[in-house]
């Protein structure tokens, strides 16, 4: 019986992967640091790329400042995250909490095979399946015609 962390390490070992990339949301940086430490303790080389890499402001491309308050003024750059990990020649990339769409762009541009450790869900403590578990109760409204 393995946790997702164990499964990722076992998969990497069986595939002969040595270099692991972590593409992380800034909101989950502490979790990514813990994951990186675990990977290093288990013999992997770890490379990281945070979503806000490059620090490019949303207002610089014409986004009105009133629309930047939800996630901040600095843009996420999942394609740049992928390119940085490509440059490091990672064998396996692991996504930690990238937003919907940003994760898709990361997967598209990553040259290495990629998997997910954490799926972002700010409401359900990063456990999106919780909504499905509550489909007959709290989320019943989602199934109504």
Annotated model-derived regions:
Residues 31-38, 103-112:
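Short Gly/Thr/Asp-enriched flexible loops that form oxyanion-binding sites at enzyme active sites
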Residues 3, 72-87, 98-100:
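Active-site glycine-rich loop that binds ribose-phosphate moieties when present
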Residues 2, 24-32, 54, 96-104:
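Gly/Ser/Thr-rich loops at beta-strand to alpha-helix junctions
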Residues 115-145:
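C-terminal functional extensions of proteins
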Residues 21-23, 92:
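Conserved beta-strand elements of the Class I
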Residues 31, 35-81:
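Long, charge-dense
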Residues 45-52, 109-127:
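Short, acidic/small-residue loops that bind anionic groups at enzyme active sites
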Residues 1-19, 26-30:
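Electropositive, gly/pro-rich neighborhoods at or near active sites that engage anionic ligands
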